[in-house]
């Protein structure tokens, strides 16, 4: 008998070009390959309605997101309230199939569905209130800082009040443990993120520069780059390339003032892949302990040495594949040591074992199917 699953996504998951939709797109693809029929529900606010999604979905439903003051509530986070479209609830109530909610964002109709004894599963992208607290600390714009702080406070209460019997599927072991121990959600488990990579493509030998890549329009990533410029590459005198989407004018000016450093704005997919492959060291610190860092997974599958701080890998299972520095001085020292050190078979073998055990889309899809049915 065929199995059908509703999936609610906070955004249109194609192109799969950022963390929140990479996991969903490749999860959807893996479920389809296991014979699951998917009814996709997503909120369209600028990414269009791509035909690509029809390859894996029995049906695709698009909804408008309410924005501005109409989505402001004194009890529900904005990211949730703005997606409380009644058309979505109407479509979900047309049958009795289980529902996978992709992120806290998509939980507006959680309780009405549970009251009807529907099987509901929540995919947790981050511990959202902690993530928004980190965004508050990284943001410079006063209006955005106020928004992130308020949203973090609302999310803290909202996440704590989620039903205790709700199965929660976290993308990192740390997040699963936090939900279990701090929020008393006993059904929280770790389900690894679904990824686009099926095999390692790391070049042996020595590359020619250090690389940081990421969405540079995100305040958290700009903070990481600024920290690297001020604290790390002022000590490690080696070529440093920063590549990513929409860097601010402020960041571009800062990079230009730093010797041995350059910035590549909005590289194409091919250009970014080439940069990742040719780098000697991927320097990818984070100041956010929650979630999983997909840019680090990209570097581990397709690049040479990876240097990180504790926050970037804690609870991820990726610690053994990375060089970890606890301070800026330690990271600079590791970079200096590795810059002329060839990347070879031993490191590749370690990554094959570590990554292959964890990020297996087929096995993880089968685990998800067993959980749901």
Per-region residue spans from a language model:
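Membrane-proximal helix-turn-helix segments that form the acceptor-binding/catalytic region
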Residues: 26, 87-93, 128-131, 139-168
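Donor nucleotide-sugar binding/catalytic pocket of nucleotide-sugar-dependent glycosyltransferases
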Residues: 148-200
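N-terminal subdomain of nucleotide-sugar transferases
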Residues: 1-58, 94-96, 234
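Conserved catalytic-core segment of nucleotide-activated headgroup transferases in glycan assembly
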Residues: 23, 190-257, 262-277
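Short hydrophobic beta-strand element within catalytic cores of glycosyltransferases
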Residues: 295-301, 305-309
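Acidic donor-binding loop of glycosyltransferase active sites
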Residues: 277-291, 302-305
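A charged, aromatic-enriched C-terminal amphipathic alpha-helix characteristic of glycosyltransferases
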Residues: 83, 342-373
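Acceptor-binding helix/loop patch of EC 2.4 sugar-transfer enzymes
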Residues: 67-76, 118-154, 215
């Amino acid at each position: 008998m065929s199995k059908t699953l509703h999936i609610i996504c906070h955004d249109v998951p194609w192109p799969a070009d950022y963390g929140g939709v990479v996991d969903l797109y490749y999860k959807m693809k893996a479920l389809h390959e296991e014979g699951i029929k998917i009814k996709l529900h997503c909120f369209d606010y600028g990414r269009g309605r791509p035909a690509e999604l029809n390859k894996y979905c029995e049906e695709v439903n698009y909804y408008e997101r309410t924005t501005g003051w109409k989505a402001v509530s004194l009890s529900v986070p904005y990211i949730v309230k703005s997606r409380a479209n009644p058309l979505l609830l109407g479509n979900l109530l047309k049958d009795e199939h289980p529902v996978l909610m992709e992120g806290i964002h998509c939980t507006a109709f959680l309780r009405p569905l549970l009251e009807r004894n529907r099987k509901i599963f929540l995919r947790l992208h981050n511990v959202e209130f902690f993530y928004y607290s980190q965004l508050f600390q990284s943001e410079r714009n006063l209006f955005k800082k106020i928004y992130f702080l308020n949203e973090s406070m609302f999310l803290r209460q909202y996440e704590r009040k989620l039903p205790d019997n709700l199965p929660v599927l976290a993308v990192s072991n740390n997040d699963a443990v936090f939900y279990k121990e701090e929020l008393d959600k006993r059904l929280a488990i770790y389900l690894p993120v679904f990824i686009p990579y099926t095999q390692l493509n790391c070049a042996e030998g020595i590359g020619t520069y250090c690389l940081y890549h990421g969405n540079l329009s995100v305040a958290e990533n700009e903070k990481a780059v600024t920290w690297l410029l001020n604290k790390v590459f002022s000590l490690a005198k080696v070529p440093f390339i920063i590549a990513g989407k929409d860097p601010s004018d402020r960041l571009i000016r800062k990079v230009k003032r730093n010797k041995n450093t350059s910035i590549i704005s909005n590289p194409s997919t091919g250009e970014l892949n080439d940069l990742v492959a040719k780098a000697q060291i991927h320097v990818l610190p984070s100041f956010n302990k929650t979630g999983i860092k997909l840019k680090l997974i990209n570097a581990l599958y397709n690049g040479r040495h990876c240097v990180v701080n504790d926050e970037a890998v804690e609870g991820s299972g990726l610690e053994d594949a990375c060089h970890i520095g606890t301070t800026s001085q330690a990271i600079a020292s590791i970079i200096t040591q590795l810059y002329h050190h060839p990347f070879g078979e031993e490191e590749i073998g370690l990554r094959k074992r570590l990554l292959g055990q964890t990020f297996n889309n087929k096995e993880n899809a089968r685990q998800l199917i067993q959980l749901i049915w």
